[in-house]
Amino acid sequence: MSIKPYGSTSGRNHGKPGVETRPPSKTVDAHCHLHIQEAADLVQGLFDQQDIPAFRHANQITTNQNIQQIKDRFMDLTNVETRLKKMDSQGIDLQVLIPVPFQHYCNVKSEVAYKAIETINNKLSETANNRKDRFVALGTLPMQNGDIAAKEMERCVNELDIRGFQIITFQDGKELSHPSYDGIWETATKLDIPIFLHPNGYPEGERLKDHYFINIIGNPMDTTAALHHLIFDGTMEKNPNLKIFVAHGGGYLPAYSARIDHAWGARPDCRGNNLKHKPSDYLKRMYFDTVVFSFDQLKYLIDKYGADHIVMGTDYPYDMAEDDPIEHVMGTEGLSKDQIEMITGGNACSLFKIK
């Protein structure tokens, strides 16, 4: 089988293209990355890419391929017209624009990082507001300081019409459940906006350097670890109305949640911070995207967590993206018309306040 880096997945047998079978309701791709060159220019030379697990734990073959991918996809990552053409070919009415993962800059130890984050949010907002019929935007946050991050949330939501924020699942040595981030979760709840969790490799990735394992295994593993901490460290308990939206189908935990419930029932050290419910009950409050590639895995997520908690996404424009998200949903057996409309756009419209 030939390699198709930016086309249909070999993870399933495809049916009719989604553009031909799409529902009449609004379709939304809720996981799409946009590169902000102005921010990259600001931090140039201020950090070592080897501080980022996705780069540090990659062999030379992977590194070379990733460099080529950025060259191949630079127009998709930066050019609105290129993006709109792709959306039209997929049958996507609206994209949720999200920063590229390595532009979180949590490892930049400088005031310049705050300026870079502000620049990213301003440019994302500008891009979305210039085409309100096709885009909304999620921002990013200066996670070096939880108080400054909370203030940036207020600015972005109140002044820029930002609809939520992407946060990387591990923050330069700190878990997302760290007390210094409590204000972020409280502010997200107050503003009634979702937080999108996205990985960027796995920090303990020595065994994952070959075969792109740092992404294939490492990304869902890092997400899995982050969700465990948010649940067991009490973040979800303390913030019952917090809306968490998770990339790549939520990593490994949604498919193996009975293990955390078993541990919670069997061991006192798994009781966490006064958890009032089974760990999986907190997981069921979260939302998961559809980037799992196979029909059976998507059907499992829908059956286990409800169609109202599954949100269509692609991870555009990378080679690990889902190229035909509508076909993926439409080809999943046993879904009702209402479920299809929720997953392909309705849930995203509710989460991100899209009219």
List each model region and its residues:
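Short coil-to-beta-strand
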Residues: 89-99, 203-204
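Mid-to-C-terminal alpha-helical segments outside catalytic/metal-binding sites
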Residues: 1-26, 30, 37-94, 122-130, ...
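Active-site gating loops and adjacent loop-to-helix segments of metal-dependent hydrolytic enzymes
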Residues: 24, 33-77, 203-221, 260-283
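Short acidic/His/Gly/Ser-rich catalytic and metal-binding motifs that mark active-site loops
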Residues: 104-106, 149, 203-210, 320-322
